[in-house]
Design a protein with these regions (language model features):
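Beta-strand-centric surfaces of beta-sandwich/beta-rich domains
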Residues: 1-6, 11-228
């Protein structure tokens, strides 16, 4: 583990290099590069999405540790287009406890790695995605912290679409195409408020589309987060 007095080499104002240098930066990605993770089918309302989220991030650190998880970006690359959805919308929530009652198969357990091979820091995050992921009802503490449509105008997603969520910063913006109502591939990035996932707290990305049919989205997933 790096000592607190370790020299830091980082461009001025670049938070990510500094955090990676200290061993606090992690990525979570789909277990098989090039293969998408299918979400649950026929999720046409927010209520249905809460029971079967696209992504669930649980902070498994002990409460006494005060170690938080801070998502910096989430990138979804469409590998299977949905059928029938009039929009592609994502709602972001925070809640107490581990809401996952049924974890998905191994294909839905994201691979977590520290991006600094010189650091011994290990993540206590539990990050799941896709079909088979089931959660209990939200508690009275549940908070909606974000809500945004990424595809509009009655057009379903297109294989190759990239949907990126950036939290608390304008850094890491991918090339953007806001032509989200046509049938061409679109790369869409939106900024969201900073999110803090405390110990024994759960953060979820719930995807839903009005009139979505039995053919669901499939996504390659990449997440960058800080744990400290």
């Amino acid at each position: 583990m790096l000592a607190g007095t370790s020299p830091i080499v980082a461009p001025i104002l670049n938070r990510d290099v500094l955090l990676a240098d200290l061993g606090y930066y992690f990525t979570a990605i789909s277990p098989t590069p090039g293969t998408g993770i299918l979400e649950t089918a026929s999720i046409s309302t927010f209520a249905l999405a809460e029971a079967a989220p696209v992504i669930s991030i649980y902070n498994g650190n002990p409460v006494a540790s005060s170690v938080n998880i801070y998502p910096l970006f989430i990138r979804l690359t469409v590998t299977q287009a949905n059928a029938g959805g009039l929009t592609t919308r994502f709602t972001l929530t925070l809640d107490q406890g581990q809401r996952v009652t049924t974890a998905p198969a191994a294909t839905g357990v994201l691979t977590i790695n520290n991006t600094n091979m010189g650091s011994g820091n290990k993540s206590q995050a539990q990050i799941y995605a896709g079909t088979g992921l089931v959660t209990v009802a939200a508690s009275s503490q549940r908070r909606i912290v974000g809500n945004q449509s990424f595809r509009n105008g009655g057009v379903v997603s297109v294989i190759g679409d990239v949907y990126q969520f950036n939290f608390g910063s304008t850094e890491q913006l991918d090339p953007m195409s806001l032509v989200e109502t046509g049938t061409a591939i679109c790369n869409v990035t939106y900024n969201f408020a900073p999110v803090v996932i405390g110990p024994n707290q759960n953060f979820q990305v719930q995807g839903w589309a009005a009139s979505q049919g039995a053919t669901q989205h499939g996504y390659e997933i990449e997440i960058g987060f800080v744990e400290k």
